[in-house]
A protein has these predicted regions:
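Iron-sulfur-cluster electron-transfer modules
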Residues: 9-194
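A broadly conserved sequence feature marking short terminus-proximal activation segments
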Residues: 1-8
Length: 198
């Protein structure tokens, strides 16, 4: 695409907003912030990319990101894959039962859902319960060994928020609010995002 963070920044400094506004490179950037950390001036290029994405008409933004954002808005679970509250709970129970049956050392393993007063509220990326449910149990084991007081919630468990990557502030806020309100209703003190834990 002939673009990189340095060129992007140069276009912004030169006031060539028209060349930035519609350039597809902003959708190739992962907003990982490495360029910001490498920048000797500490310029937040990721924030600039976010604002450049925001200039695109919503219906012209990448369909995969747009679809995932809209899916999370359509269900109270917050899942970008559309996994319902009941399906999420079923997957947890199924994996928990399998672990207890096949791994006797883990017969006491717990994966609480909607546990009132738990200290930690744990969100979950939809990919695991949807495609790789066996990837959920290792974290449960770590939390069990550490004696952590935690819970999932049926409402707002979806930890991925594609609305942020879409640069859709209102939708981002709505998905986030759903999750945080769920954590608050349960009386949890700390929100843990699954992607940050492991």
């Amino acid at each position: 695409e002939g673009m990189d963070p340095r060129k992007f920044l140069r276009l912004a400094v030169l006031g060539l907003d028209d060349q930035i506004a519609g350039h597809p490179w902003v959708w190739m950037c992962s907003m990982c912030m490495r360029c910001t950390h490498a920048c000797p001036m500490g310029i937040n290029i990721g924030a600039m990319v976010y604002e450049a994405r925001n200039l695109w008409p919503r219906d012209q933004r990448p369909k995969g990101i747009l679809g995932s954002c809209d899916m999370a808005l359509r269900n109270s679970s917050g899942s970008a894959m559309g996994i319902s509250e009941d399906d999420f709970e079923w997957v947890i129970e199924d994996i928990l039962e399998e672990v207890r049956e096949t791994q006797p050392a883990w017969k006491e393993l717990q994966a609480p859902v909607d546990k009132k007063g738990a200290y930690y509220f744990l969100s979950q990326n939809s990919r695991e319960p949807g495609i790789e449910p066996e990837e959920m149990a290792p974290l449960w084991k770590i939390l069990h060994i550490a004696g952590v007081d935690w819970t999932y919630s049926k409402r707002g468990w979806g930890g991925e928020n594609y609305c942020m990557f879409l640069a859709d502030d209102q939708s981002w806020e709505k998905v986030t609010r759903n999750t945080i309100e769920s954590a608050m209703e349960l009386g949890c003190k700390v929100y843990l995002d699954r992607k940050s834990v492991v």
